[in-house]
Amino acid sequence: IRDRANPFLGYRAVRIYEEYASLFTTQLRSILRASAHGSLKIMIPMISSMEEILWVKEKLAEAKQQLRNEHIPFDEKIQLGIMLEVPSVMFIIDQCCEEIDFFSIGSNDLTQYLLAVDRDNAKVTRHYNSLNPAFLRALDYAVQAVHSQGKWIGLCGELGAKGSVLPLLVGLGPVSYTHL
């Protein structure tokens, strides 16, 4: 993949999987094979549409069938999750809950994309604020929507590491926090 002006947007994560479908299938098969030896989950980054979710699920089903045909053991109930980091997916969480087992909010990327702030551009970094009311509403909406469907949701990124924000995060309800 060639260098791009803004590598955080555009062609990365789930968006490259189709071009590299055979590599993606190999990775899925490897994860599935490893799942026979311990508890594993699969989480897909940069999801922005149901079409991407359904494509990933199709590839996962194909990889599972290949392993069944080869009599290779794996966890049939391996969970599939997505990162909530592209704002468009926030508006289809209800549909995502029908197809996905768990969610993780990528606070760094979601803040950047929701507020249209390039974290690496010194002229606009002052606008990068995970405590912006719009971001907090999005966070609350995601947690409530996912919980209403009985699904697990976590939070990763810098926001989860800020001790001063912990009371606010606890107020959202049961969410796991990870600093990445």
Residue ranges and their predicted role:
Residues 1-180:
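Conserved alpha/beta-domain cores
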